[in-house]
């Protein structure tokens, strides 16, 4: 995709689909070309080579998220082999900076979208539920990347997070219900009060240098 005047209609369509401005789309198109080596699609290998991801404790989950059909709005499960620029924009829209002019409804939609994306990262088997063990494992992986937290402490914090999640979920259940895992509604309750709208970003794609959405 070129971003010349002849592609203005295509750019407007991308603005409508992703919420990015034309300026932001141009910025991301340059980043896409840099990552893909000027190829029309990005594959896993392109993301594997990003230096900022090498030491990230959830590197594989981040890369998987770019090819997850759920995040690409292509189906309830499975992965694609490669993504084009429009699909790249769809994924990047989950990390879109908030605008100061967004109303409460749009902020709520943005928050839900971000949490759904995060839920999909935890829900590795695509069954619309997160087991407590899956949740504990990801929390531990996230903490393991912090040089100030020892492995045993990371495991202890992750265990605590798992127990807290269980208490929130089980507390909502009827007496005869069997606990099967964290649903998305449960996940929303667990993350209630956490400012995911501004904290969820992706540094290696230089999102912080992109102007806020209008």
Curated annotation (Swiss-Prot):
Main subcellular localisation: nucleus
Lipidated positions per record (N-myristoyl glycine): 2
Signal sequence region: none
UniProt subcellular location: Nucleus; Cytoplasm; Membrane; Cell membrane
GO molecular function, one term: protein homodimerization activity
Positions that bind Ca(2+): 123, 125, 127, 129, 134
Membrane topology note: Lipid-anchor
A single BP term in Gene Ontology: cellular response to retinoic acid
Cellular component GO terms held in the UniProt record: cytoplasm; lamellipodium; nucleus; plasma membrane; ruffle; ruffle membrane
Keywords, comma-separated and alphabetical: Calcium, Cell membrane, Cell projection, Cytoplasm, Differentiation, Lipoprotein, Membrane, Metal-binding, Myristate, Nucleus, Protein kinase inhibitor
Family annotation (SMART domains): EFh
Family annotation (InterPro entries): CHP3 (IPR052490), EF-hand-dom_pair (IPR011992), EF_Hand_1_Ca_BS (IPR018247), EF_hand_dom (IPR002048)
UniProt domain EF-hand: residue ranges: 110-145
Superkingdom in the source lineage: Eukaryota
The keyword Nucleus is annotated on this UniProt entry: yes
Task performed by this protein: Functions as an integral cofactor in cell pH regulation by controlling plasma membrane-type Na(+)/H(+) exchange activity. Promotes the induction of hematopoietic stem cell differentiation toward megakaryocytic lineage. Essential for the coupling of ERK cascade activation with the expression of ETS family genes in megakaryocytic differentiation. Also involved in granulocytic differentiation in a ERK-dependent manner. Inhibits the phosphatase activity of calcineurin.
Notes on the domains: Binds calcium via its EF-hands. Calcium-binding mediates a conformational change. Can also bind magnesium.
Subunit annotation: Monomer. Homodimer.
Similarity comment text for this entry: Belongs to the calcineurin regulatory subunit family. CHP subfamily.
Stated name of the protein: Calcineurin B homologous protein 3
Organism of provenance: Xenopus laevis
């Amino acid at each position: 995709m070129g971003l010349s005047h002849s592609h203005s209609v295509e750019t407007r369509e991308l603005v409508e689909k992703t919420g990015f401005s034309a300026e932001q789309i141009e910025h991301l198109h340059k980043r896409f070309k840099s990552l893909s080596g000027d190829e029309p699609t990005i594959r896993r290998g392109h993301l594997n080579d990003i230096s900022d991801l090498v030491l990230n404790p959830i590197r594989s989950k981040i890369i998987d998220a770019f090819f997850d059909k759920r995040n690409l709005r292509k189906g309830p499960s499975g992965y694609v082999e490669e993504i084009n620029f429009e699909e790249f924009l769809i994924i990047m829209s989950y990390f879109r900076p908030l605008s100061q002019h967004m109303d409460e409804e749009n902020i709520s939609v943005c928050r839900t979208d971000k949490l759904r994306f995060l839920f999909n990262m935890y829900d590795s088997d695509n069954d619309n539920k997160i087991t407590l063990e899956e949740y504990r494992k990801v929390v531990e992986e996230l903490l393991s990347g912090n040089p100030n937290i020892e492995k045993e402490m990371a495991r202890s914090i992750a265990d605590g997070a798992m127990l807290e999640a269980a208490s929130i979920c089980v507390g909502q259940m009827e007496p005869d219900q069997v606990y099967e895992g964290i649903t998305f509604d449960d996940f929303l309750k667990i993350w209630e009060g956490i400012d995911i709208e501004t904290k969820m970003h992706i540094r290696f794609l230089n999102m912080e240098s992109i102007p806020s959405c209008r």
